[in-house]
Structure formats: C-alpha cells, structure tokens
Design a protein with these regions (language model features):
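Phosphate/pyrophosphate-binding catalytic cores of soluble transferases and nucleic-acid-acting enzymes
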Residues: 1-315
Length: 315
C-alpha cells in the first residue's frame, strides 16, 4: 500500500510554492485537487502554479478542460487515481495538492451511492428546477437549499448553480439532505493508500489580507485581459469553470454594468467567501494541522510539511 502525501488548505494559504519545494525534495509530481485550476484559459484567475513552477516539477490536472464542461468530484477522483497510479508506476511519488475538501474526500474515502430513483421523476424534477433557475436566479435557489440542507449550502457558492441544483434534486427525490446521504452511503475509494494529509492553516485576518493582496496581484498580471479572451471565445459567465471566483464580476465590468473599483471589492469578497466554504470542509478533516504565521513563506512551510511527512512514514 503506497504512502501518499496530501497538501490541503484554503485558497491563498500558501500551498503551491511549498508543494513544489516538497516535490523536489521527495522526487514527486503534483496532482491538483483544485476544482477550477483544471480548466483551460483560467490560469491567472485561478492562481494556477506559474509556468516556472511547472517547469521545476510536473503538474497534473491543471489547464486541461474546457470551462464549459462539468468537472465533478467523481470525475476528479477517477482521473486523479489513474494519474497517481501512473506516477507510482514510473517510480516517482505523487503529491495531491489543493483546496477542495470535497474532491479530496472523494479520492480518499469514495463518493456516496445515491439510492435508486424513478428516471422519469428525476427528469421532471430536474426540468422544473432548471426552469426555476432561469426565472428566479441562483440566489433564490441557494436560499432554499440553505433551508433543506444547510451544511451543503455552506459549502456551495451562491453562483454555483450546478451544485445547488444537485442538492435540491437529491432532496426532492429522496426527502433527505445530500450531506446525510453522503455520510450513510459511501462507496469504495478509487485508490487505496496510506494517506498523509497535511492541512495548512492561517489566522483568518492573515488569510484575508493575503487574499486581498492576491486579487490585486492577479489583476496586475492581466486577469481582466484573460476574462476578455473568455468573452471573445463565447464562454458564458455562468459556465461551470467560472463560478465563485470573480469572473462573473469581470464580465459585468467589461459589459459596462459595474465600475472597476466595485469589481475589485466584489472579487475580494468572493475570494473571502470561497475560503470560508473551503474551511467548512476542512474542520472535520483528519489531518496534520500546521498553523502558519504571517511571515512564513514557502521554504518554512515546506520544511513543516516534510517534518509531518517523515513522522507519518516512521514505522
């Protein structure tokens, strides 16, 4: 059974740079467990590892899928398991790196198996929910989700119509919250390993300060131009790859609906909200928790991760 390291933590905590240093130390390759970095054309806005970092260490599941495609936890778990097996077969060590606690759970524990339901009833519910989404918007449906499955709603962005509809569909079909079914009906994980999960944490003020600075940095790096290119390619603002990170606000700004200053402040708020949702998944995660200080950079972080890894591997 292989030992596999997972480096987890909310967006902006400092995973990418440290993960490259760790991979260089243990002859590893990084497998992204990020629900947005997998999409093509979102390199700047998702703060994907830079080309310089990717030259130093091979990265997988980054910049691979069309942003119009649905990329689910199940798809990630299957792809990641195959990638991990290939890395091991080549004599190297896989590192799973990312901020999606749901994706990490799907890989390490498996996904829930939904009880059977009448296909016709499922189609009717799905069509009715989609019609409501078009008429009422995702915010109204998110409010409804919060009433029937508050735990799932806390982990889902208000703009993430795909996951909102999924939660409401399951509740209408079975009368049980999706999160309850996930606890009761786990399937087998796609790969069996001795997982060493290291969770990076920061004081909330420190994390939010880092996120605010990151948004400014991404805009300076050309994020608005990246959004303009997506618009030119006819990628809609509600495409699966664009939810919850600020692309919708950049689209609104490019269409003259919102000022640049309001766009920037709105994006910063979206990033803080996204980090809150990630943290809700991490609270219950079984992991080696590393509390980082504001001055801790990639080198210090990598050293702490390696200490946890070496302790994990001791007989």
């Amino acid at each position: 059974m292989p030992d596999i390291l997972i480096i987890a933590g909310p967006t902006g905590v400092g995973k990418s740079g440290a993960a490259v240093l760790v991979a260089e130390e243990i002859d590893g390759e990084n497998v992204s467990a990020d629900s947005r970095q997998v999409y093509r054309g979102l390199v700047i806005g998702t703060a994907a590892p830079s080309p310089q970092l990717q030259k130093r260490v091979p990265h997988h599941l980054i910049n691979e899928r069309d942003p119009r495609e649905v990329w689910s936890a199940g798809a990630f778990a299957s792809e990641a398991a195959g990638t991990i097996e290939d890395i091991i077969a080549r004599g190297r060590r896989p590192l799973v790196v990312g901020g999606s606690g749901f994706y990490i759970r799907a890989l390490t524990e498996g996904l829930f198996e939904e009880p059977p339901a009448d296909p016709g009833e499922r189609r009717r519910i799905r069509a009715r929910l989609r019609s409501r989404l078009e008429k009422e918007g995702s915010g109204a449906l998110h409010d409804e989700l919060a009433r029937c499955d508050p735990e799932w709603a806390r982990a889902v962005a208000e703009a993430d119509s795909q996951r909102i509809l999924r939660g409401l569909e399951v509740y209408e079909l079975h009368g049980v919250p999706l999160t309850d079914l996930q606890e009761e009906r786990q399937s087998n994980p796609p790969i069996v390993a001795r997982w060493c999960t290291v969770l990076l944490e920061r004081d909330r003020k420190d994390l939010y300060d880092r996120l605010n600075a990151r948004v400014e940095r991404l805009l300076d790096a050309g994020w608005l131009g990246e959004a303009r290119s997506l618009m030119s390619a006819k990628v809609p603002a509600d495409a699966p790859g664009l939810t919850g990170l600020g692309y919708d606000l950049l689209f609104d700004h490019l269409l003259g609906r919102i000022s640049f200053d309001d766009t920037v402040e709105g994006i910063k708020q979206e990033h803080r909200n996204y980090a809150k949702r990630q943290l809700s998944w991490f609270r219950a995660m079984d992991a080696h928790r590393i509390r980082l200080e504001p001055q801790d950079g990639p080198e210090k972080t990598a050293g702490l991760i390696l200490d946890a890894w070496h302790r994990h591997r001791k007989p």
